[in-house]
Amino acid sequence: MAHSVKIYDTCIGCTQCVRACPTDVLEMVPWKGNNKAGMIAAAPRTEDCVGCKRCETACPTDFLSIRVYLGPETTRSMGLAY
């Protein structure tokens, strides 16, 4: 499936999204940004994303630091395409 996963710099490095992903799309990588963990989520295997959005649900930040954008084949099958 052709989903894209976007990680924003509001990520606090808590690893909740990584642990929630059933297909191991996400991993933590070193980051020199403004979080105490010194790590940020990354999505090196987006081709394995099934679009379940468990990562979004698991994210504890008010900013929703991770977003899954469903591919056109999924939105079409769900009746969400224009």
Curated annotation (Swiss-Prot):
GO terms for molecular function: 4 iron, 4 sulfur cluster binding; electron transfer activity; metal ion binding; oxidoreductase activity. Its main location: membrane. Residues 2-31, 40-69 form the 4Fe-4S ferredoxin-type domain. InterPro entries: 4Fe4S_Fe-S-bd, 4Fe4S_Fe_S_CS, PSI_iron-sulfur_center, PSI_PsaC. GO terms for biological process: photosynthetic electron transport in photosystem I. It is found in: Cellular thylakoid membrane. SUPFAM superfamilies: 4Fe-4S ferredoxins. The keyword Hydrolase does not apply. This is Photosystem I iron-sulfur center. The gene is psaC.
